[in-house]
UniProtKB/Swiss-Prot annotation:
Its EC number is 3.5.1.88. It comes from Listeria monocytogenes serotype 4a (strain HCC23). The gene is def. GO terms for biological process: co-translational protein modification; translation. Fe cation binds at residues 110, 153, 157. Transmembrane segments: none annotated. It is an enzyme of class 3 (hydrolase). The active site is at 154. This is Peptide deformylase. Its cofactor is Fe(2+). PANTHER family: PEPTIDE DEFORMYLASE, PEPTIDE DEFORMYLASE 2. Keywords: Hydrolase, Iron, Metal-binding, Protein biosynthesis. It catalyses: N-terminal N-formyl-L-methionyl-[peptide] + H2O = N-terminal L-methionyl-[peptide] + formate.
Amino acid sequence: MLTMDDIVREGHPALREVATEVTFPLSDEEKKLGRDMLEFLINSQDEEMAEKYGLRGGVGIAAPQLAVTKRFLAIHVHDEKDRLYSYVLYNPKIRSHSVQQACLSGGEGCLSVDREVPGYVVRSERVTIDAFDENGTPLKLRFKDYPAIVIQHEIDHLNGIMFYDHINKENPSYLPPDVDVFG
């Protein structure tokens, strides 16, 4: 079972590397790590498990956050209609994105960042993702609103990008016109 001790923190070189694609068939270790990542997210959202094991709540995690510089991630997040998006995705790529942008009212956080970073992180409001499941089956998934923000945050990790790289350095509270704000 993964715990917070397994997650590398900002400053670790794996967080700034561009991760390499996995090849199929996946190794048993890659499959297990993907499943463990999803289990971590589920446990972190369970109040009893989170308290017992000292887990910070998370909705997404990428392999580089575990010092594994390979292109896979897990998300476990509900949208505003309580629809669950629970996936382990291998070699995910953003196929297309909306012109309309969105951000979270309270900014973003990260399991690898142990501090609050104020500022808006503006992202696409909708994205279409191409990816593979653990069996190598191709997937085409659409995300909008909060789940779209989460998946973009995690794909950024695969490209060595941290959420705060997107924050306006001169004015963190600057919000471009016509950006939808959630939360």
